[in-house]
Amino acid sequence: TSENGSLVINGEYKLTVELAGLTLTNPKDPAIDIECSKRIGVILKDGTVNTLADGKGGTHKGAFYTEGHPEFEGGGTLNVTGNTKHAICAEEYLQFKKSTGAVNIIKAVSDGIHCGKGKQNDDNSHFIINGGVITVNNAGSDCIDADDYGCMYINGGVLNLNVSATDGAGLKCDSII
């Protein structure tokens, strides 16, 4: 538990991060910042509750940020608050596997979950849900956004999307859902 900390990983290879009862707030930057453009396994350890939040007014893209493609799994719970921009931001695709527990976006200034770099020419910005219960509340823009001509694949799981922004969407996609 830390109210003034972060996990920063720089790498060039696939990696796995296990969250097992983590409470992490960074008042200036992302709580988790993974600077690796490969596959990032994110295990939510069964029976644990993990809470992430970033600070207000920074320039970062999310409380949980990765350059690569996170694949969430495990029966735990992840609660994320995005006080600067997005709650969860992946510059490539993002996947919730069949074994994923619960992911709760408590609040986000912009998108609850954002996939993409914002370059409008990258078609690797997909949102994939195969399982889990994903809940997005209090998003300042869209609940889930697959940018850059990305697609959305909804193969299972549960999406609870509570649109609160006047011009926001539950699911926003530049290509096909």
Predicted regions and their residues:
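A composition-driven surface/loop motif
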Residues: 1-177
